[in-house]
């Protein structure tokens, strides 16, 4: 869940973040005035602030390699993207997007991401600029390995991942948890996708990795249904529409993780199984034995294999009760959030869900949609 930020000379400026967040929750629950803005960065430094955004959307999907992208319409006749040094062109410029509410003296807004511009165009009549951009993982992905890159055996995984990113796309801020896992000898050949390898390394120790609303590179444990919920979708509150879908396709009840590292002298494997007797997708006769195999050269110990298997199982556990909801726009929400869903007519009573996909509109009339997944269907 993203934290909101206060801009301008308003009463909330000296308040702690939890008070600002509470004020924001109260405001968006009633009629309010939309506030959006775009800042432009070059070489990780803000060079222009407060550019007017007239429409567009931000789309995020935790199952995609590049998690977030945006399409934005900007009304600023003095900044039309034509020449290479115009700041809305795809020559290294980035958009930092915000959405929130206007209040007396300023705005309270949440950061939606920092997006390197990929494509820009301008309408010659209206002078409206259209921008397409992707989050900063695109910059890492573009920086393929031009030569062989090697990580020494025994390197801490967090250290190795940060160095791997810095080698191709320097200057980012990293928010990584501590880990005791260390790497085997790892060699990456020319033209391999740097970001894809970073994600595989993070996944091998049970983590997800992405760029957050402020453009920081974040690594954290995969979300699970034991996590404390940070929000809700509820009738009579923020739910505008909902469709429920049940699909066993992406569901697995066992994950077997093995090492494919050729430097190991003996096979290394680990697993995680849905053994919960109350689970309708329990590994066994009723649901069936539906296992998924995962192999990675980054796995070198049984503990690491078990950790990776548990993280993958947590994201694929049980028949997914998938809910496609239209909700009151809340820019604090982000994919991987654990939330509750309440809709009495559908038998949903504060059921835990993980946000898998979401689209957030940037215009005053544009809504917010979210696809959320429950752990399992109650028996």
What are these regions (language model features)?
Residues 45-62, 209, 238-241:
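Extracellular/luminal ectodomains and secreted, surface-exposed scaffolds of diverse proteins
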Residues 123-248:
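Charged- and aromatic-enriched interaction segments used to assemble
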């Amino acid at each position: 869940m993203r934290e909101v930020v206060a801009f301008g000379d308003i009463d909330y400026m000296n308040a702690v973040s939890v008070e600002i967040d509470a004020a924001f929750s109260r405001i968006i629950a009633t009629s309010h005035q939309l506030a959006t803005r775009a800042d432009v960065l070059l070489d990780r430094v803000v060079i222009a602030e407060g550019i007017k955004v007239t429409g567009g959307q931000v789309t995020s999907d935790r199952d995609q390699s590049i998690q977030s992208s945006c399409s934005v319409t900007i009304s600023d006749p003095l900044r039309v993207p034509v020449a290479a040094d115009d700041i809305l062109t795809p020559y290294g410029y980035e958009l930092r997007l915000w959405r929130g509410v206007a209040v007396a003296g300023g705005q309270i807004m949440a950061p939606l991401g920092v997006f390197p511009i990929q494509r820009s165009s301008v309408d010659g009549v209206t002078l409206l600029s259209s921008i397409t951009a992707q989050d900063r993982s695109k910059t890492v992905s573009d920086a393929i390995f031009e030569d062989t890159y090697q990580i020494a055996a025994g390197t801490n995984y967090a250290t190795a991942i940060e160095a791997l990113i810095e080698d191709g796309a320097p200057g980012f801020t990293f928010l990584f948890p501590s880990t005791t896992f260390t790497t085997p000898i790892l060699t990456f050949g020319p033209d391999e996708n740097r970001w894809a390898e970073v994600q595989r390394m993070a996944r091998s120790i049970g983590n997800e990795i992405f760029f957050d609303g402020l453009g920081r590179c974040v690594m954290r444990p995969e979300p699970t249904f034991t996590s404390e919920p940070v929000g809700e979708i509820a009738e009579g509150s923020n739910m505008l529409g909902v469709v429920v879908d049940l699909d066993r396709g992406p569901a697995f009840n066992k994950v077997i993780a093995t090492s494919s590292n050729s430097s190991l002298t003996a096979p290394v494997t680990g697993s995680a199984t849905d053994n919960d007797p109350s689970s309708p997708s329990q590994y066994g006769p009723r649901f069936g034995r539906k296992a998924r195999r995962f192999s990675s050269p980054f796995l070198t110990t049984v503990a690491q294999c078990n950790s990776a298997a548990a993280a993958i199982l947590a994201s694929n556990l049980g028949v997914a009760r998938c809910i496609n909801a239209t909700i009151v726009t809340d820019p604090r929400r982000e994919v991987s959030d654990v939330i509750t869903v309440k809709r009495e007519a559908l038998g949903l009573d504060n059921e835990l869900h993980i946000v898998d996909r979401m689209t957030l509109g940037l215009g005053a009339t544009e809504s917010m949609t979210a696809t959320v997944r429950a752990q399992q269907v109650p028996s």
